[in-house]
Amino acid sequence: MAKKWTSFPHADPSFAYAGPRLKKAWARLHRGDCEPFPAEPATAEAWRLFHAGDFQQAVDAGRNAKNAGINVAVKAQCVYANYLETDAKNRLALFQEAAGWADERRAAAPRDANAHYLYAFALGRYGQGISVAKALAQGFGGKIRDALAKALELAPKHAEAAVAFGAYQSEVIDKVGGIVAGLTYGAKKESALKHFELAMKLFPESPIVHIEYANGLILLFGKARLDDATRLYEQAAAKKPADAMERLDVEHARSELE
């Protein structure tokens, strides 16, 4: 954390949820991850920084707040690494560190659905960075699957966990084939599609839900579903972002369409 991170390039005053605005907007901001409004002011402040795009400060604030604040730190570090970190080695290190924080949090608070999801999110992004094949060989597949299943058991309306479960299954099927994916990793095409549709139903405003669904369709069906995937990307690109993370998702969708 010594190195100053790249600043969020799309600063927007509407993402600054000062004072009571944060609680008022909380349901919309956290429709995707079902994070409850923080009991501790320090954790609320960390989330305020996250939504504004002050990711490095959000990590520091979340780590200092401890307990539920760890979830902010993990999510902020992963969003930053995914979209704004330009060095591949640093990106992997950030994901790996965040996965460790999330693993500690879920061990300390096993009923925290978001901690399980964020562990899977960080580990999944790390796995994508080293290659899906290497991640599966190192046993990440089962860990990601189990963490997402636990998150959805604890919070059935967790849209981000639902779409991540669809994405996980799609990537495994694409890498090892349907039969091995089903027998070894419990990944099935029908289940992937079901979880994508669930996420769309739970959080239709989310750009990342549309993006991951589109990616999943390409992995599962290839060119046969390219038109559907393109339409989902177009819908993602047209969404009105509620915070910095969603703005980065929207910009990603737009760049993929260019």
Give the residues covered by each predicted segment.
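Alpha-helical adaptor scaffolds
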Residues: 157-204
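N-terminal alpha-helical interaction modules that lie
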Residues: 1-155, 160, 193-195, 202, ...
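Conserved alpha-helical positions within TPR/SEL1-like repeat arrays
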Residues: 117-118, 163-164, 211-212
